[in-house]
Amino acid sequence: MLQNEKYKGDALLQKTYTVDFLTKKRIDNDGQVNQYYIENNHEPILDREKWEIVQLEIARRKKFREQHKLQFYIMQKENNPFTTKVFCAECGSAFGRKNWTTSRGKRKVWQCNNRYRIKGQIGCLNNHIDEEMLEKAFMKAVGQLQKHRSDVVAKWQKLEQGTNLLYKHYSKQMYQILDLDKFDGVIMNQVLDHISISEVGQIVVTFLEGTEVFL
């Protein structure tokens, strides 16, 4: 819906055309007749810059899905904020959440989806990680940015002065983590691109505006 140009006040004329004037049958115009694009045709529902950001974000998510071989891009900000956010540095597969029952109670752990893709066979050898450790890793990365506040703020200000609307938007989102002192899944989803985990335990946290933190 938000991909429709009407939301930013523009109009694309002759999306369809009449093929039978007696029955008034119309079909989609796939280049058979000329189309006309009119800017500022009417009062926009969404301002032009926000509309453009939405289109860029849709394209980014599509590219993200293709790069990480995901069927869907899912954002469960509160109940499961790490969905489609954690990836294996060894095989590239996404990590999935598992609920383990132990003598100490239930544990939420994440492991590579290629670990047991074929029943009874061990695939990827990467280790699992507790969800609590993922939260701590994100907060540790945030702490690194807070520690180098002046440097990252200078980077964000430079991005805000640039022409890339999406990076300008991401940079503005990043300021909210400068005073973050506890994990918040909603905020994390607004600033995090992904987390990668290697077999030797190295964690790389990549933020949407391009900053990488190696832990």
Where are the predicted features?
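Short, hydrophobic/π-rich interface segment
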Residues: 173-177
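Conserved catalytic breakage-reunion loop centered on the nucleophilic residue
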Residues: 1-136, 142-170, 183, 191-215
